[in-house]
From Swiss-Prot:
Active site per database record: H141, S262
Pathway as given in its UniProt record: Purine metabolism; AMP biosynthesis via de novo pathway; AMP from IMP: step 2/2; Purine metabolism; IMP biosynthesis via de novo pathway; 5-amino-1-(5-phospho-D-ribosyl)imidazole-4-carboxamide from 5-amino-1-(5-phospho-D-ribosyl)imidazole-4-carboxylate: step 2/2
GO terms, biological process: 'de novo' AMP biosynthetic process; 'de novo' IMP biosynthetic process
Natural source organism: Staphylococcus aureus (strain MW2)
Gene expressing this chain: purB
Superkingdom classification of source: Bacteria
UniProt subunit comment: Homodimer and homotetramer. Residues from neighboring subunits contribute catalytic and substrate-binding residues to each active site.
Keyword annotations of the record: Lyase, Purine biosynthesis
EC number: 4.3.2.2
Similarity field: Belongs to the lyase 1 family. Adenylosuccinate lyase subfamily.
InterPro entries: AdenyloSucc_lyase_C, Fumarase/histidase_N, Fumarate_lyase_CS, Fumarate_lyase_fam, Fumarate_lyase_N, L-Aspartase-like, Pur_lyase
Protein's name according to its UniProt entry: Adenylosuccinate lyase
Binding site for N(6)-(1,2-dicarboxyethyl)-AMP: 4-5, 67-69, 93-94, 212, 263, 268-270, 276, 307-311
Function (record text): Catalyzes two reactions in de novo purine nucleotide biosynthesis. Catalyzes the breakdown of 5-aminoimidazole- (N-succinylocarboxamide) ribotide (SAICAR or 2-[5-amino-1-(5-phospho-beta-D-ribosyl)imidazole-4-carboxamido]succinate) to 5-aminoimidazole-4-carboxamide ribotide (AICAR or 5-amino-1-(5-phospho-beta-D-ribosyl)imidazole-4-carboxamide) and fumarate, and of adenylosuccinate (ADS or N(6)-(1,2-dicarboxyethyl)-AMP) to adenosine monophosphate (AMP) and fumarate.
Gene Ontology MF: a single term: N6-(1,2-dicarboxyethyl)AMP AMP-lyase (fumarate-forming) activity
Lineage start: Bacteria, Bacillati, Bacillota, Bacilli, Bacillales
Length: 431
């Protein structure tokens, strides 16, 4: 991922240095496991643990000759050791190291992403509570529907991100597993105890059955889950973009002193952060196809997935980490124009209370079809002539003979839409 959309904490996880360090840890743990089984002298393992070092430049230099990165790596590490070097990579195949270490690196990335998710969820919870009773216009098909509250909107985002967090925790169990089962997965030259020891000490699980590789349905599920999280962010970002339109202006991204919105138009204050999140989400989603096409490998292995994953996994995790952090800050610093929200409710001349009038008539004994046919024409006239809807309702004796002034007051009271907000918040776990 390009530096512009990267945070150092996450980018450092995907460096060659960290990858080789992960490989080395797998190799050393394998030696320790062999030692526990009495196959490698403990003194040799201690020397390997103490003296084995990674030198990325030297490993890459050797790779120019070997054309095999793991062979180059093991030879480079062996250069830092004495006679004990013969135990490095003992009984292992390359993918025992690569796939297990990759899962360990992904675990490191996942630790960061999980913290990102929790921080964002905390911000959403705070916003939901702060604006719990802040009335605003609810819109369906882009058209005014009925009042809701900005807090309910934030509660919706909160519960969606809670689901994303649960899905993420589930996929961690799928993706954070290792395999050290040999060339075709039969443990022909390495006992299962080695795999169990290594994975336990790395803090990851073990695949119950594998070939030379971990099966890539795990990685496809992982990428799809990250893409779904990114898509939720995009959904929220698009909402902010729409609510920041000049004609609506119910929220606005923070605009710093000295910030510029346009090279040509000095007045511009654009939702560029949310637009940025939208674009990043598209990039992340684009990798779903790659992840799924990596699943059908040939027989017990091929490496067609390898080149794709070297690009995909860093890009997706780095981009999502960046997006989560940036969008958390956007929401945290969001300006909310409560007066504009209330004013927008009044823009449609009271039409948004049409269902309240309809239900009131039904409750007084009128047949639904008759009530609907009385209310709808008034709504159409109000929309076309900009006449207050209530005024038209009050001019119809067939309605006023059924509904009293007090009952109409209740129909046109926007606070009615707050009646169940407490219940919604309780159900969302925000009480």
């Amino acid at each position: 991922m390009i530096e512009r959309y990267s945070r150092e904490e996450m980018s450092n996880i995907w460096t060659d240095q960290n990858r080789y360090e992960a490989w080395l840890e797998v190799e050393i743990l394998a030696c320790e496991a062999w030692s526990e089984l009495g196959h490698i002298p403990k003194a040799d393992v201690q020397k390997i643990r103490q003296n084995a070092k990674v030198n990325v430049e030297r490993a890459q230099e050797i790779e120019q000759e070997t054309r095999h990165d793991v062979v180059a790596f093991t030879r480079q590490v062996s250069e830092t050791l004495g006679e004990e070097r013969k135990w490095v990579h003992y009984g292992l195949t390359s993918t025992d190291v690569v796939d297990t270490a990759l899962s360990f690196v992904i675990k490191q990335a996942n630790d960061i992403i999980e913290k990102d998710l929790e921080r964002f969820i905390d911000v959403l919870a705070e916003k939901a509570k702060n604006y719990k009773y802040t009335l605003m216009m609810g819109r369906t098909h882009g058209v005014h529907a009925e009042p809701t509250t900005f807090g309910v909107k934030m509660a919706l985002w909160y519960t969606e991100m809670q689901r994303n967090l649960q899905r993420f925790k589930q996929v961690r169990e799928e993706i954070e597993v290792g395999k050290m089962s040999g060339a075709v997965g039969t443990f022909a030259n390495i006992p299962p105890e080695i795999e169990s020891y290594v994975c336990k000490h790395l803090g990851i699980g073990t695949a119950p059955v594998s070939t030379q590789t971990l099966q890539r349905d795990r990685h496809a599920y992982y990428i799809a889950t990250l893409a779904l999280i990114a898509t939720s962010l995009e959904k929220f970002a698009v909402e902010i973009r729409n609510l920041q339109k000049t004609e609506t202006r119910e929220v606005e991204e923070a605009f710093a002193k000295g910030q510029k919105g346009s090279s040509a138009m000095p007045h511009k204050r654009n939702p560029i952060g949310s637009e940025n999140i939208t674009g990043i989400s598209r990039v992340i989603r684009g990798y779903i196809t790659t992840a799924y096409e990596n699943v059908p490998l040939w027989h017990e292995r091929d490496i067609s997935h390898s080149s794709a994953e070297r690009i995909m996994l860093p890009d997706v995790t780095i981009a999502l980490d960046y997006a989560l952090n940036r969008f958390t800050n956007i929401v945290d610093r969001l300006t909310v124009f409560e007066d504009n929200m209330r004013n927008n409710i009044d823009k449609t001349f009271g039409l948004i209370f049409s269902q309240r009038v309809l239900l009131a008539l039904i409750n007084k004994g009128m047949v639904r079809e008759e009530a609907y046919d009385k209310v709808q024409p008034k709504a159409m006239i109000s929309w076309e002539t900009k006449t207050p809807f209530r005024e038209l309702i009050e001019q119809d004796e067939s309605i006023t003979s059924v509904l009293t002034k007090e009952e109409l007051d209740e129909c046109f009271d926007p606070k009615h839409h707050l009646n169940q907000v407490d219940t919604i918040f309780e159900r969302a776990g925000l009480a």
